[in-house]
């Protein structure tokens, strides 16, 4: 006796369906429980920030330098690349020399990207002088070195 296609699908995926129903139910239960059990502030100062008894001065918004976001993006990018290298390292015997060559090319591309980031100054935290000023300073230093030799 053969089962119909829909019965086979249900037989194979019933556990996932139950998991999905329980997960959604648990989320709803926590939201409803927090709504019933949570405290309610119905005062005039409900939406003002708590400053430990001190009157707040100025705005609560902070301006962060874009360098923080760049470092975070570089971290994520290089972290994902490390994940790829870890996956490669676990299967190094199966992929053989071809996999090794591909990983070496991948690492060289990463190094080229890192060199590019250093060259454009994306990793410099100090206030930078203009490129023209740096070049003039380097040229002046090399000229004085030539004259002293």
Swiss-Prot record:
Protein origin, superkingdom: Bacteria
Keyword Hydrolase: no
EC code(s) of this entry: 7.1.1.-
Primary localization: membrane
GO terms of molecular function: NADH dehydrogenase (ubiquinone) activity; NADH:ubiquinone reductase (non-electrogenic) activity; quinone binding
Chain coiled-coil ranges: none
PANTHER family: NADH-QUINONE OXIDOREDUCTASE SUBUNIT A, NADH-UBIQUINONE OXIDOREDUCTASE CHAIN 3
Assigned protein family: Belongs to the complex I subunit 3 family.
Record's function text: NDH-1 shuttles electrons from NADH, via FMN and iron-sulfur (Fe-S) centers, to quinones in the respiratory chain. The immediate electron acceptor for the enzyme in this species is believed to be ubiquinone. Couples the redox reaction to proton translocation (for every two electrons transferred, four hydrogen ions are translocated across the cytoplasmic membrane), and thus conserves the redox energy in a proton gradient.
Protein name per Swiss-Prot or TrEMBL: NADH-quinone oxidoreductase subunit A
Species of provenance: Cronobacter sakazakii (strain ATCC BAA-894)
């Amino acid at each position: 006796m053969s089962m119909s296609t829909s019965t086979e699908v249900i037989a194979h995926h019933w556990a996932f369906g139950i998991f999905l129903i329980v997960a959604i139910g648990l989320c709803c239960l926590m939201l409803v429980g927090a709504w019933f059990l949570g405290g309610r502030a119905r005062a005039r100062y409900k939406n003002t920030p708590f400053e430990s008894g001190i009157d707040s001065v100025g705005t609560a918004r902070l301006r962060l330098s874009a360098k923080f976001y760049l470092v975070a993006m570089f971290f994520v990018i290089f972290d994902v690349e490390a994940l790829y290298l870890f996956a490669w390292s676990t299967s190094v015997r199966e992929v053989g020399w071809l996999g090794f060559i591909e990983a070496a090319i991948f690492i060289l591309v990463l190094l080229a990207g890192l060199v590019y980031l250093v060259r454009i100054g994306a990793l410099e935290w100090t206030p930078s002088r203009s490129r023209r000023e740096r070049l003039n300073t380097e040229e002046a230093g090399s000229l004085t070195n030539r004259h002293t030799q």
